[in-house]
């Protein structure tokens, strides 16, 4: 079997396509807009009692079935966090542009190559960009039905924001390719346009000056909230692509990262999946 990664694993969001993607001008303070659902004031978070996948787990997603001797196209992405529903289903969170409902999900590897033969560990059951009533959020939910040896590039506390007075001014992200990278917040939630291959969608996202690349999509974005490391978002896209052969450590860039807010995702999860355990 020959494998081929999709060429648009990680979405690029450029200032040419959307004014909201433009960085804050010199001398301006980051502006914290109200969250897309409601203005949430207290800082609150929760830690799922049962989490099948650790934040930062590598995932491979595809609508195709791998066959010996045939090309296999798949999306290389990362999980942000996971949780259990009241009906005992276990769910992982990633980016919507990583997969459509019905796509199968496999455990990813450290080198990014698809491990064959392998059994799927789950299936995408909701992807907001493909929903009839989209909420303009780059988020997908995966029902986990199997297990495997998972690759996780680092450790992040599985504490997820449910409400925030404002986002942390300094955030980090964990992705399967570039591991942990950190930087300063540029602005809070605003409408942006995501472009990935033939997919163009409006999306509500915050922005930070953080380096990332293909395969990191869907990973956790986190920062310190009241002295505690807390996941505040999910990696969505960047203003620039990391050139082949370059790394975040060796490349000086003005790259900016867009991320979907965890608070919005929590509201959406309850709406489309039901109550959590």
Please place each PLM-identified region on the residue numbering:
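Secretory targeting and sorting signals
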Residues: 1-28
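N-terminal activation segment of mature serine protease catalytic domains
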Residues: 32-84
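Polar/charged, compositionally biased leader and regulatory segments
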Residues: 28-48, 52, 107-110, 114-120, ...
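Active-site region of chymotrypsin-like
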Residues: 67-77, 149-155, 180-277
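Penicillin-recognizing serine hydrolase domain
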Residues: 36-48, 163-164, 186-200
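Serine endopeptidase catalytic core focused on the charge-relay Asp
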Residues: 73-193, 223
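Hydrophobic alpha-helical membrane segments, chiefly transmembrane helices and signal peptide h-regions
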Residues: 12-19, 81, 136-141, 237
